[in-house]
Amino acid sequence: MWRETNIAFQHYLRLQRGLSQNTAVSYGLDIEKLICYLEKYNITETPSNIEEDTLRQFVYEVAKDLNARSQARLISALKSFFKFMMYEKGREDFPMSLIESPKIGVKLPDTLSLQEIDAMLASIDLSTDEGHRNKAMIEMLYACGLRVSELISLRLSDLFFDEDFIRVMGKGSKQRLVPIEAYTQKQVKQYIDNQRRQLKIAKGHEDFVFLNRRGKQLTRAMIFTIVRQVAESIGLQKTISLRCSASGSS
């Protein structure tokens, strides 16, 4: 039953959620880890009745050999799987509700400390619409470890906050799923539901998450300028290093 359900889950990810085959298979492999764990310990619980304690024990055992980012993806896959089960009326409860992803940690540029990034975020003027956008943008840029090109290309249809991940098109047009912390989600949601909603969005730019005041997709140059200005506002004179596009150019 588990493997048949896992196959159906992967079809759901592709057809209903629009994820690539590689991404769906990747999530399926995470579920396969759970299946192997259940087989190893002769646990007979099914997708419909597996309990939270069993899932918690599985995550604890497997997570010991994974870094924080891989742990977060595993938990994201499990959450997606059991939300799929609820979607298919396979169960009424959500056994992953109390199992949280680990802190992934901020991917820092070479020249900035965590304290400096926190100071930058705290310094942003939230009395303006751009301030709310910039805080959400910088929070996502660093907390999710995105390249600038990935940030400006991010679309509303790439946000899967119910499953705690975003879909990113990386180098070579390869799709990947990036876990996103609840705090970062909150910042982005506030921007989308408030400041972004007030914009007159230009035709063809409706799906981009981060927009300029004319309702158009931001450019890389704009991102660099915004981050540099925020850094300078707290007295940071050092060069700000951001992860750039696939070409590695700045």
Predicted regions and their residues:
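Conserved catalytic core of the tyrosine transesterase superfamily
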Residues: 1-250
